[in-house]
Amino acid sequence: MFYHLLYPLHTAFAGFNVFRYITLRSIGAAVCAFLLVLFLGPLFIRTMQRLQIGQVVREDGPETHFKKKGVPTMGGLLILLSVTVSTLLWARLDNPLIWLVLLVTLFFGMIGAYDDYKKISKKTSEGLSAKGKLLLQIAGALIVGFFVYLHPGYDGQLSIPFMKNVQPDLGWFYIVFAVIVIVGASNAVNLTDGLDGLAAGPMVVSSAVYLLFAYLAGNVVLANYLHIPYVAGSGELAIFCGTLFGACLGFLWFNAHPAQMFMGDVGSLALGGALGSIAIIIKQEFLLAIVGGVFVMEALSVMLQVGYFRMSKGKRIFLMAPFHHHFEKKGWSEPKVVVRFWIVSIILGLFAIATLKLR
């Protein structure tokens, strides 16, 4: 909105010319989203407490989690509000990629909100059925998959880190691949959101890295120089990534141990869906496995645990899954698990950036 309202005035006052720069608007979007969450957070917490919308805790979970029962949840609504407002204020609204990512993010948020509502209303950790949730996620991911495959300028080619001349073309199967990436990312972030600040921290890192890659992918000179796919208009997604960065950082203010509120499925499913969608749109799909390594690790731990449990008829690989619970069972304190996972996330984020030159 600022671009459309203020940039045209640069002919009368040169200072308004700054609104054409993606870098400035990305910073503005991040700061705006951060401040929105920071200032609205206390009001949101009081409102959730008054409405008695609190966290439901698993009976078979670690005993240290029982004290989390009743802590305000669905903080993802606040994240989505700040992301939406900041995006509408700072992004170019004539860019279809902005609308695509924003609407898909909100759609995944709606899935999570309904899931949270069912959990809270039933006072149980079981919400929307796994099959129902998966079908809705697939429907949302298909929107991105079909858009990317059918939109002029896109194709079914993959961009593989470390290999500048290897770009396999999946053809129509790219749509299926896109669904796997987006749905997988959404569920991976959801599984990670089990400790105070555990999901928000890596999301800050991931959104910062994808902000950089979105900016580079939207600049034809830099994209060609770095041997990454050029995607016309994707530079504006740096602004959306900025809103994710700011919103998650602001949320972390209240979600750090001991948490004053949780994001709920409305937050985790939406953030994961947003991350996966951005990865698909800017053609940096495999980079997500690196920068989102913490999310991947958490998801894999659940799949391995369930698979091995069934194959071995009752035996387990980990003391408890997802992976963060394994370390809790080993005696690590919650803050220690979270901070160490943050450290891993930062290292992976830096490594992801390094892939720009390791080709």
Curated annotation (Swiss-Prot):
Q: Which NCBIfam families match?
A: mraY (TIGR00445)
What is one process in the GO biological process aspect for this record?
A: cell wall organization
In terms of PROSITE patterns, this protein maps to:
MRAY_1, MRAY_2
Q: Which UniProt keywords apply?
A: Cell cycle, Cell division, Cell inner membrane, Cell membrane, Cell shape, Cell wall biogenesis/degradation, Magnesium, Membrane, Metal-binding, Peptidoglycan synthesis, Transferase, Transmembrane, Transmembrane helix
Identify this protein by name. Answer: Phospho-N-acetylmuramoyl-pentapeptide-transferase
State the function annotated in the UniProt record. Catalyzes the initial step of the lipid cycle reactions in the biosynthesis of the cell wall peptidoglycan: transfers peptidoglycan precursor phospho-MurNAc-pentapeptide from UDP-MurNAc-pentapeptide onto the lipid carrier undecaprenyl phosphate, yielding undecaprenyl-pyrophosphoryl-MurNAc-pentapeptide, known as lipid I.
Record keywords: Cell division included?
yes
InterPro entries per record: Glycosyl_transferase_4, PNAcMuramoyl-5peptid_Trfase, PNAcMuramoyl-5peptid_Trfase_CS
Top-rank taxon of the source lineage equals Bacteria
Q: Name one Pfam family in it.
A: Glycos_transf_4
Under CDD domains, the record lists: GT_MraY
UniProt similarity note? Belongs to the glycosyltransferase 4 family. MraY subfamily.
GO CC term, one of those recorded: plasma membrane
- Major localization listed first in the record, in broad terms: membrane
Q: Which cofactor does it need?
A: Mg(2+)
Catalytically driven reaction(s):
UDP-N-acetyl-alpha-D-muramoyl-L-alanyl-gamma-D-glutamyl-meso-2,6-diaminopimeloyl-D-alanyl-D-alanine + di-trans,octa-cis-undecaprenyl phosphate = di-trans,octa-cis-undecaprenyl diphospho-N-acetyl-alpha-D-muramoyl-L-alanyl-D-glutamyl-meso-2,6-diaminopimeloyl-D-alanyl-D-alanine + UMP
User: Which pathway or pathways does this protein act in?
Assistant: Cell wall biogenesis; peptidoglycan biosynthesis
Question: Which GO terms fall under molecular function for this chain's record?
Answer: metal ion binding; phospho-N-acetylmuramoyl-pentapeptide-transferase activity; UDP-N-acetylmuramoyl-L-alanyl-D-glutamyl-meso-2,6-diaminopimelyl-D-alanyl-D-alanine:undecaprenyl-phosphate transferase activity
